[in-house]
Design a protein with these regions (language model features):
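Active-site beta-alpha turn of Rossmann-fold NAD(P)-dependent dehydrogenases/reductases
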Residues: 1-2, 26, 38, 68-70, ...
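Conserved beta-loop-beta element that borders a ligand/cofactor-binding pocket
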Residues: 2, 49-74
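Active-site proximal helix/loop that lines the substrate pocket
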Residues: 3-9, 74, 131
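Catalytic helix-loop patch of NAD(P)-dependent Rossmann-fold dehydrogenases
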Residues: 6, 11-59
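Short, flexible, mixed-charge acidic loops at enzyme active sites
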Residues: 12-26, 78-87, 140-142
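Glycine-rich "substrate-gating" loop/helix at the edge of Rossmann-like oxidoreductase active sites
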Residues: 38-42, 70-71, 75, 90-103
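Glycine/proline-rich active-site loop of Rossmann-fold NAD(P)-dependent oxidoreductases
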Residues: 58-63, 74-90, 112-122
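Mid/C-terminal beta-alpha module of Rossmann-like enzyme folds, strongest
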Residues: 108-163
Length: 171
């Protein structure tokens, strides 16, 4: 399995303060985002994805999914979030304020396994289309990731991690 840590999201900072956040190459993040992994856990996720690339080169008919889960929660935690959304953009900035319900994560795994129409190795970000922020995503990005280029404007509370690739490949 993989996670969004394959790009080095959480493991790079000793403490998440303004001068310690390593911004990604661009927003929204996607399957082509490079890594800035420095810690053993993130490096292991990144290496696992490269092993998937190698398997796919040798066996191009195989379907290999690196599922990049982010903030996977159950109903109880969702209720807490609804009651107290994040207003400080530095809170959970290392996870890019995204989340996924455990049922949706499980559904993505089942579909990836059951769907026989795709081949090769794919990196799939598995996350909701919105954030857990009480402020617009663009405002949070401007506060925390001031130097990261934007490939497009993100409306309202849109996730700064694109899940378009997973939608295109497995639905």
């Amino acid at each position: 399995g993989s996670s969004y840590n394959a790009i080095g999201a959480m493991g790079n900072a000793q403490r998440w303060e303004a001068n310690q956040v390593n911004p990604p190459d661009y927003f929204p993040l996607d399957q082509h985002s490079s890594t800035c992994a420095e810690d053993p856990y993130s490096i292991s996720k990144w290496l696992g994805e490269h092993i998937g690339d190698a398997f796919a080169r040798r066996n191009p008919q195989m379907a290999l999914a690196s599922m990049r889960f982010n903030g996977m929660w159950d109903d109880q935690y969702f209720e807490q979030l609804r009651g107290d959304p994040i207003s400080d953009p530095w809170t959970r900035c290392q996870g890019f304020w995204t989340y996924v319900h455990i049922r949706d994560a499980a559904r993505a795994c089942v579909v990836a396994i059951a769907d026989r129409t795709w081949q090769g190795h794919h990196r799939f970000f598995i996350n909701a289309k919105d954030t857990m922020l009480a402020i617009p995503t663009m405002q949070a990005l401007a506060a925390v990731y001031t130097d990261a280029p934007l490939n497009c404007e993100l409306p309202d509370f849109a996730s700064p991690i694109s899940n378009q690739h997973v939608a295109d490949i497995i639905g």
